Amino acid sequence: MVIESEINDKKRGLESSSPTINDPKKVKVESPSSGKEDGEVDEVTSSPASRETSSSKLMSPSKNQSSSSSRSYHDSNNGYRRKDERYSSSRSYDRNYRDRDISRDGDRERDRDRERDRDRDRDRDRDRDRDRDRERDRDRDRDRDRDRDRDRDRDRERERERDRDRNSQERGSRNSHERDYRDNRDYSRDSRDNMDSRDNKNGSRQSINNNTLSYEKQADRKDEVRVKDNISVNDDKTNHGENLTNESITATSTNEPTKPAVIIEEDEETKTKRILEENRLQRQLIMEKYNKEQPQPITSSLSTTEKEQSNTNTNSNSTPVATTTTSILAKSPSNLENQIEEEDESIIIEWRKDQNSENSSAFNDNNNDESCSSEEDLKKRGKIKEEDIKAKDKPITTTTTTTTINNVSIKLPPKPEPIKAKTSAPVFDMFSDSPSDETDESNRDLNETNGGGVMVDANIVVNPSINLSDNWDDADGYYKFRVGEIMDKYQIFSPIGSGVFSTVVSAKETKTNEDVVIKIIRNRPSMHRSGLKEIEILQKISNTPTSSNQKSHCIQMKDHFNYRNHLCIVFEPMSMSLHQLIKKYGKDIGLSLNAVRVYAKQLFLALKHIKNSKILHADIKPDNIVVNEAKNTIKIVDFGSAGEIHESEITPYLVSRFYRAPEIILGHKYDYSIDVWSVGCCLAEFFTGKFLFPGKTNNDMIRLFMEYRGAFSKKMLKKSEFVSNHFNENLVFMKQEIDNIEKTVRKVPHDITKPTKDILQFLLPKNVSIPDQDMKKLIQLKDLIEKCTILDPEKRITPFEALNHEFLKPF
């Protein structure tokens, strides 16, 4: 617009400055005869007298033609001038536009250079932080190596002190042996000198007795030394035999040269008789004590049972507790301790982490350590009622009587007359409608099969005198089974345990004599439906094909049937759960690294098979993982909480709390990755014997998650339903604390952005050192656990990826 206005002003100026043909004073005349150049204009001023003449001339035709030519000339000049002005204005516009573009490009280039400098500074800061982190890690590794070397030196010094003590004890034992031999030799010489010829025989017997006593003392000392060092014991035996032979030959070289061999034989025979006599007296004292507490018929049957059981082979794997008890009573205390120690060592030597630890062999089923059960969570989810949880703590109800000798429970043989037990709850005799001969025969066959009895808790002593054929359950819906009872085609062998949903017993198939485990579901409609759902899932898992060289590592269901309004599921037998294995062989110290590797590979194979079956287990924990007798194969059991992926419900109480994934607590959509999280928690517990996330509440669990794994992503928190229970509107974690004074729960902001705890320090404390090869494997285990416990379920490792992890490869 500015340019157009300038052009119009120029046009107006030109029009005002150009002469017109109507101007009477100025006339352009072209005179070719004059000396002026072409294009010059003469201005002629006419007088008033000549105006008339000129006006008359203008009226003539020739004058009109000259005026028209002059007008066309002026018009052409004006057109040229306008074109030039228009062209110059357009060129100036292009020049301005081009200058403006150049300035814009310069500004853009300057911004680009500024951004490049900013990126360069940012990269420099990042490199500086990375170098600082590397230096910090290097210092941490250096400190860890220094601590490891210090621990190794301390262990080496401890071993040297132990060797020093052992050598001093060996020297003391040798000196005591030599002193006893000298005293023995002098005493035997003096006794022979003072003996008369008629008391020769008595004197020889006395020397035999003296030598027997010294031999027993030496044998006892040798037993003590054997526990400390077997090699030194063998040397002591050799020296003792040489000294004894030389001294015997010296003492009797003049009279009886063959007597030393006779003395040794008589010593061994006397020692055997003494041990038998002590055992007989011990049994007699026990029987006298037992006779005071029990009626005479029970005593006679017990003694008969003991005589039968004393002839059985105690090394058999199927030997029940009663047989073991009588064999224990028939041994001396020192021999008993040695035998138990050797048997335990032969079983657990490959699975202990520390064979010299006293805690590794401590095991008590009644130990009330802190554990996590899903029963309270089932109550919160509405699956079970309050009285169902209380019913779990009640003892298993059977009609088997027991007695206790030296804190060992022994099943008594069946008696012709009913015996009243100490418990007040009356229980019927479910075999009362059968002939007594058949009942006695079945019990007799069971005793012969079981070796005379089974281990039964003393709390299950009941009164079998009640006869109610229409009532098979107790008040809580548990089936009141009886040892020896035949259910369908299976004969009950012994009780195993009871839970909220069922009672578990061991049994044998009557035709094939095959060992099985029967799960007897409680007589409740909801639990019956859960049992049917478990059967359906087990059938689906068993029908899913596996790889040719792999196993499913899931418990196999053999049969199922209904018996007296109870759904019964038959499984293959296994030894114990991994929870019991850790309590027995690795309490507070865990299992060996190789055992954890073997178990981890089998667990991921099981997860892979379960995922291929489109099933979520939703309750993986050491209690639901069983191991075989050889302790080299594990299987996942208890699919009562399992289901298909489309059946999953958003609830914060799914899975046992210590093994519960964060997406369950936050109310986020979950899938098969919750089982991977549970397996990661189990692996840490296998190696340490302790819980990785021992939270008391869901809020406490989230705090532990963030301390070990860092903060949650805001994207995940925004998609969760229960995020308001644990985070504020700014997505800051709110820690729940209990006010001890007001007894109220208050929420305190507890912002955690980075991990404050390390899983490697949880696996290996600072005061523990392991070999370098095991350290490499332990770092791989830590990496596998971290990938299994990633907070985001979409980034968590899958079972197939875990099977290719470095930790699962052999050493």
From Swiss-Prot:
**Limits of the Protein kinase domain:** 490-808
At which positions is ATP bound?
A: 496-504, 519
EC number per UniProt = 2.7.11.1
Q: Which residues form the active site?
A: 619
What is the name attached to this protein's record? Serine/threonine-protein kinase prpf4B
Which parts of this chain are annotated as the region Disordered?
A: 1-257, 288-341, 353-379, 408-452
Superkingdom, natural source? Eukaryota
- Renumbered to this chain, the Low complexity biased-composition regions fall at 46-71, 310-327
Q: Which organism is it from?
A: Dictyostelium discoideum (Social amoeba)
Give the GO terms filed under biological process for this record: mRNA cis splicing, via spliceosome; regulation of mitotic cell cycle spindle assembly checkpoint; spliceosomal snRNP assembly; spliceosomal tri-snRNP complex assembly
Q: What post-translational modification does the entry describe?
A: Phosphorylated. Autophosphorylated; phosphorylation inhibits interaction with its targets.
- Compositional bias (Basic and acidic residues): 81-202, 217-240
Which is one Gene Ontology cellular component term of this protein? nuclear speck
> Belongs to which family?
Belongs to the protein kinase superfamily. CMGC Ser/Thr protein kinase family.
An example molecular function term from Gene Ontology annotations: protein serine/threonine kinase activity
The record's annotation in PROSITE patterns points to: PROTEIN_KINASE_ATP (PS00107), PROTEIN_KINASE_DOM (PS50011), PROTEIN_KINASE_ST (PS00108)
Name of the gene this protein is made from: prp4k
Q: Which reaction does it catalyse?
A: L-seryl-[protein] + ATP = O-phospho-L-seryl-[protein] + ADP + H(+); L-threonyl-[protein] + ATP = O-phospho-L-threonyl-[protein] + ADP + H(+)
This molecule's function is given as: Serine/threonine kinase involved in spliceosomal assembly as well as mitosis and signaling regulation.
SUPFAM superfamilies linked to this entry:
Protein kinase-like (PK-like)
Q: Where in the cell is it found?
A: Nucleus; Chromosome, Centromere, Kinetochore
Q: Which InterPro entries does the UniProt record give?
A: Kinase-like_dom_sf, Prot_kinase_dom, Protein_kinase_ATP_BS, Ser/Thr_kinase_AS, Ser_Thr_dual-spec_kinase, STKc_PRP4
**UniProt keyword annotation of Protein biosynthesis present:** no
Compositional bias of kind Polar residues: 203-215, 241-257, 293-302
Key words of the record: ATP-binding, Centromere, Chromosome, Kinase, Kinetochore, Nucleotide-binding, Nucleus, Serine/threonine-protein kinase, Transferase
